[in-house]
Every structure is written in structure tokens, then in C-alpha cells.
Regions:
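Conserved alpha/beta cores of soluble small-molecule-handling proteins
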Residues: 1-132
Length: 132
């Protein structure tokens, strides 16, 4: 998926998919100081978006970091990213992680990053089955 066309919401800005990069010494990579959600949109509506976003923020608080955006900003960014990628049936992956400012178990001084990627993911069910 590295060379996919599209946009990713990255720290508040929409950037080209291929430009969404992080440093190899990112704390989130070495110490698993990251949180994510997996969401689905059907016909342009994100299923249980508020609940997923609240859980993302709760998970971050359990790892003792604050996502530098509000719940509402993340929800809006999810829809914006879908819209700018012209997707309606899609998978949405919001993720937040500690940066590479320091490597070591304690990372209170690291910057918190946030991104939202989306990609096409058709429904598993036919239109008739979805009505059951």
C-alpha cells in the first residue's frame, strides 16, 4: 500500500499518501506507544464513529498521552479524509503514537502524532442482505 494514490490526514493536514512517513526510531514503533481504531463506512456513513473515537481517546489516556486534537476534530477529519479520497464504502484507520524525540522506556517528552488513513473496502454483504 506504500505507493497508493490518495490522501492521508496527518497531524491536521491532508498530505499525499506516499508522503506519510515516520522515523525508524519512533517510540510508538519500538515500545508500542500507539493506539488505533478500525472503522467502516457504508454508503458514506461511518459506523459508530463517536464510540470508536471515544475509545481511541480512552486508549491514549491508558498509555498516558493526550491526542492533540478533540474528539470532534478527529470525527470531522475522518469524514474529510473519506470525502477527499472519494470513498463511501471504506475502511478508516485513525492512529496516534509517540514520536522519535527520545528512545527509552519513559517518553513523556515525545510529541504525539495522529493520522487517519482510508481505503476502499466494499461491503461483505449484498444490498438485500444488508436489509435483513
Amino acid at each position: 500500500m506504500e505507493d497508493k494514490e490518495g490522501l492521508i490526514w496527518y497531524n491536521g493536514d491532508l498530505i499525499d499518501w506516499k508522503d506519510a512517513k515516520l522515523h525508524v526510531l519512533t517510540h510508538g514503533l519500538h515500545y508500542a506507544s500507539s493506539v488505533f481504531e478500525g472503522e467502516r463506512s457504508y454508503s458514506g456513513r461511518i459506523f459508530k464513529l463517536h464510540e470508536h473515537t471515544e475509545r481511541l481517546f480512552f486508549s491514549a489516556s491508558e498509555l498516558d498521552f493526550d491526542i492533540p486534537f478533540s474528539i470532534e476534530e478527529i470525527k470531522e477529519a475522518c469524514y474529510l479524509t473519506l470525502e477527499k479520497n472519494n470513498l463511501v464504502d471504506a475502511y478508516i484507520r485513525p492512529i496516534a503514537w509517540r514520536g522519535a524525540e527520545t528512545v527509552g522506556v519513559s517518553a513523556q517528552s515525545t510529541k504525539i502524532h495522529c493520522a487517519i488513513a482510508v481505503w476502499e473496502w466494499p461491503s461483505y454483504f449484498s444490498p438485500d442482505d444488508r436489509l435483513k
